[in-house]
Regions:
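Internal active-site segments that recognize and position negatively charged phosphoryl groups
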Residues: 173-177, 234-260
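Short, surface-exposed beta-edge/turn micro-motifs
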Residues: 41, 171, 306-309
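Intrinsic disorder/low-complexity segments
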Residues: 3, 191-227
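Glycine-rich anion-binding loops of enzyme active sites
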Residues: 60, 96-190, 338
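N-terminal glycine-rich phosphate/pyrophosphate-binding loops that anchor nucleotide-derived ligands
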Residues: 1-89, 364-366
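Glycine-/charge-enriched secondary-structure boundary and capping motifs
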Residues: 1-28, 51, 71, 107-132, ...
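Active-site glycine-rich loop that binds ribose-phosphate moieties when present
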Residues: 148-166, 226-243, 292
C-alpha cells in the first residue's frame, strides 16, 4: 500500500528539508550576517569577541514528554525550543544558534511538521536565534525531537555567567515570576482528558507572536481552561530576566523545569547549603489557588515546567535588581525564602508553613528512570 501523499514517507527526506528550511525563512529564523546555516556540512558561526559560549541540549519523545492529542504541532515547536532557551536564560546568557534533529516514523503529516517549524522558528526569531540546521532520521516507533542551542555571555559583563554552585548561607531565595501555572494546565488535561482542544488554543492566537503569548492569571476573573493550557504549552523563556540578574551582580540561578523543590535541591547539592522556603511567600496566582484549592501547594512546588528563574542574591544585589526590573519593565522578583547552612540531617530543604511550623521536604525532581 503506498504511503499517504501528505506524509513524510511520501515526500522523502531531502524534499522535507527544503520545505522546513522555507518555513524557517518565512518567519525570519533561517539567516544571520555572522552565520552560515542550512545547506552545508556544518554551520559556521562567529561568536562575539570576549564572550563565553553556553551550550545546552534537550530531547522530547512522544508519549513521554508530549502528546499530540493534547497539543498542536505549532505549540510543540514553541515549547521544544523554549525549554532550551530557558536553560540559556538560567545561565544569564543570550541564545544565538539552534539545531533541530527529528526522529520520524514516516507517518507524520507534512503540514504538521511545517507548523512545528513555524512554531519554533517564530520563537527563535523573537529572540534573535537562527536555526542553523540539524538532522532527520527514521524512528521505528515514535516521534522524537532533539534540540541544541548555543549561546554566549552578554558582551557587556566580561564573560560573567550564572551557575548553581555559588549560593551562600544568608542569601535570599528568589523566583522571577508565578509558580504552578503550567502544572495547573497539565492537571487540567489529565483530569478532563481533553482531546481536540489542542487547536482551540493555537487558533485563537493566530497572527500573534507565540513568544509573547501568555495567560491572564491575575485573579481578576474566573480561571479558564485555556489560561492554564497556554501556560503549559507555551512557556516564556526568561532571557531578559537572566540578563538583569547578571547585571545586578547575581551569581546563582537555574530554571524551574522539574519543580521548585526538585530544582532547589540541585542548587543546595551543588552549593553545599540548605534552604528554608516560606509557604506564605510563594507567588501562586489566585486563579491557580481557586481552581485547585486543595492542591495548589503541590502544583507550585512539585509540578514543574514553570520555566521561571530560581536564584539567590544578597540584599545589595536584590536592591539593584529591583531597580533594573522597574527600568526594564520586568516583573518584580519574589523573595520566597533564605539560604541556610546545610542541616545536620537531610533533606536540605525545609518548608515554613503559615503557622510557623517547619517541615523537611524531599527534592523529588522528575527522573526519567524512576520506578512507579
Amino acid at each position: 500500500m503506498p504511503p499517504d501523499p501528505q506524509t513524510v514517507a511520501a515526500l522523502g527526506e531531502f524534499a522535507l528539508i527544503d520545505r522546513l528550511a522555507t518555513a524557517l525563512a518565512e518567519v525570519g529564523a533561517a539567516a544571520a550576517p555572522d552565520l552560515l546555516g542550512i545547506g552545508d556540512d556544518a554551520a559556521i558561526w562567529m561568536p562575539t569577541p570576549g564572550t563565553r559560549a553556553v551550550i545546552t541540549t534537550d530531547s522530547l519523545i512522544a508519549r513521554i514528554h508530549f502528546r499530540l492529542d493534547w497539543t498542536s504541532w505549532r505549540d510543540l515547536g514553541h515549547k521544544a525550543l523554549a525549554t532550551n532557551l530557558s536553560d540559556v536564560a538560567a545561565m544569564g546568557a543570550r541564545p544565538r544558534v539552534a539545531t533541530v534533529s527529528l526522529a520520524l516514523t514516516g507517518a507524520e503529516p507534512i503540514a504538521g511538521l511545517l507548523d512545528l517549524y513555524r512554531g519554533l522558528g517564530t520563537l527563535a526569531a523573537a529572540h534573535g536565534v537562527v536555526v542553523a540546521g540539524g538532522d532527520i532520521v527514521a524512528s521505528p516507533e515514535r516521534l522524537g525531537l532533539h534540540l541544541t542551542v548555543v549561546g554566549e555571555s552578554w558582551p557587556d559583563f566580561d564573560g560573567r555567567l550564572l551557575t548553581r554552585d555559588r549560593a551562600r548561607p544568608g542569601d535570599l531565595l528568589v523566583v522571577s515570576g508565578p509558580l504552578g501555572r503550567s502544572a495547573a494546565g497539565l492537571e487540567t488535561l489529565l483530569r478532563s482528558s481533553i482531546v481536540g482542544r489542542r487547536s482551540s488554543v493555537s487558533d485563537r492566537s493566530a497572527g500573534k507572536s507565540l513568544a509573547s503569548a501568555s495567560p491572564d492569571l491575575s485573579g481578576d476573573r474566573r480561571p479558564t481552561t485555556d489560561d492554564f493550557l497556554v501556560a503549559h504549552h507555551r512557556p516564556t523563556p526568561q532571557i531578559a530576566y537572566g540578563r538583569a540578574i547578571v547585571a545586578a551582580g547575581g551569581r546563582v540561578a537555574m530554571d524551574l523545569s522539574d519543580g521548585l523543590f526538585g530544582d532547589l535541591a540541585k542548587i543546595c547539592a551543588r552549593s553545599g547549603v540548605g534552604a528554608i522556603v516560606e509557604e506564605g511567600a510563594l507567588p501562586v496566582p489566585d486563579a491557580v489557588r481557586a481552581a485547585f484549592p486543595d492542591e495548589w501547594l503541590r502544583l507550585a512546588t512539585r509540578g514543574g515546567e514553570d520555566y521561571e528563574l530560581l536564584f539567590t542574591a544578597d540584599v545589595a544585589t536584590m536592591d539593584r535588581l529591583r531597580d533594573l526590573c522597574v527600568a526594564r519593565d520586568l516583573p518584580a522578583p519574589a523573595i520566597i525564602g533564605i539560604i541556610t547552612a546545610p542541616p545536620a540531617i537531610a533533606p536540605p530543604i525545609r518548608l515554613r508553613r503559615i503557622d510557623g511550623r517547619e517541615e523537611p521536604v524531599g527534592g523529588g525532581a522528575f527522573d526519567h528512570f524512576a520506578g512507579g
